[in-house]
Amino acid sequence: MQLAGCLALVVAVLAVIVHSWRFDHKPRIYGDRLPRRVLLPSQRQVQRKIIVYHNFFRTRVDPKASDMLALTWHREAARSAQAWANRCKLLAHDSISGRWIDDFGSCGQNIFISTHRVPWFFAIKTWFLERHNFTYGSRGNSLMKVGHYTQLVWAATHKVGCGFSECGGHKKYFSYVCNYCPIGNHLERLGQPYSRGKPCSGCAKDCNRRRLCTNSCWAADLWANCQELYRTWPNWLCRSQHTSQGRQRRDNCKATCTCAGKIK
């Protein structure tokens, strides 16, 4: 009798579960169930979501970052990302000139492709999950294995613009492209894409409610050794604009010359 009672109870519970399950509530994630319009970065709402997702993951690094800048949308970066997404080159990256943005130079680029339409959150999270291949502070990190992650969480990057395209041909797929300015993934610092420490401890009072820094620089250095040059010859580098060579030096080291106290 006890066994019969237990079986009856199990059957009753299963009946309740089956009855209460709504088959019309399947996740609207894959295929045509996800409308194309909710993926188009030309839409302001989509732009806001992309920014929120990026900044969410930038606060989830381990170890914590003391100097992680908040990302904001950049129209020109989005335009170049969309142009490249439209080319449908699978996972190949755009050229240096194709990613060039005034004041920032060539920007970084992450690409995600899928055989189905998936939310931007899924694409960005896929890049972030490369953190499992990453060791902070190590010289042994491989750009091929962690490059999407390190660009996503590169502290000095503070502008992003993205593009989305449906690619035809024999096998249809969807291309998600984001360009990041200023560019990250400098090989000599690949193991330290940000400074380790308490969130916002590296930006004093320039911190938002998400504990991300806001003291970004409006431009980027185009020469790799601008800061070294400034330490030795500051006037020669930044204050000799009376000659064409002086103006050229300053133009190539805008961040060093004009953004004291900023994260760059």
Regions found by a protein language model. Give the residues of each.
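Mature extracellular or exoplasmic CAP/SCP-family domains and secreted bioactive peptides
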Residues: 2-264
